[in-house]
């Protein structure tokens, strides 16, 4: 795995490839790093910055000054093939805020092996951070995420509880 990445998420596609999407520590451009493996995770190729799924988080302050955003952990799941007519459908979750702070927990959908993420749906508009996704063979999707109390909180680490959102792919597809 490439240096400077961490808290990566993985999904195996139906053709055997493994997709890797990672938080990029100290990312200057605010982009997550992605890669694919064709051999079960032994070697990773096509390292690149993801243009759609961007990092969030305020600049990291330390005793010598300010560093770029430290990013945020995210969730990733491939939906069971029996719920998607045999097609790879990936879902990705993380806060989505162009302003940088950790708010607006959002789920994105990909239908082409994580090359593009054309659909996204807001789950929670307030403070939110780390998330995890799971799906069952009945079509239920489960999102756990850190959640704050107020969208007006300036401190992006004020996440008071873990929340569970349950939905299905149709709900995601009704997003933008």
Q: Which ranges hold each PLM region?
A:
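Asp-box/BNR beta-propeller blade signature and adjacent active/binding-site loops
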Residues: 1-176
């Amino acid at each position: 795995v490439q240096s400077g990445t961490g808290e990566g998420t993985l999904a195996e596609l139906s053709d055997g490839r493994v997709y890797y999407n990672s938080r990029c520590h100290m990312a200057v451009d605010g982009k997550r790093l992605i890669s694919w493996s064709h051999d079960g995770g032994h070697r990773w190729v096509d390292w690149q910055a993801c243009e759609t799924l961007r990092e969030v988080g305020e600049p990291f302050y330390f005793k010598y000054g300010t560093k770029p955003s430290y990013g945020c952990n995210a969730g990733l799941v491939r939906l069971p093939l029996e719920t998607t007519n045999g097609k790879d459908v990936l879902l990705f979750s993380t806060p989505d805020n162009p302003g940088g702070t950790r708010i607006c927990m959002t789920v994105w959908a990909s239908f082409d092996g994580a090359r593009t993420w054309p659909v996204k749906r807001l789950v929670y508009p307030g403070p939110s951070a780390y998330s995890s996704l799971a799906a069952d063979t009945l079509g239920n999707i489960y999102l756990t995420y850190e959640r704050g109390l107020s969208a007006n909180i300036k401190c992006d680490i004020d996440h008071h509880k873990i929340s569970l959102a349950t939905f299905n792919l149709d709900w995601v597809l009704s997003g933008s």
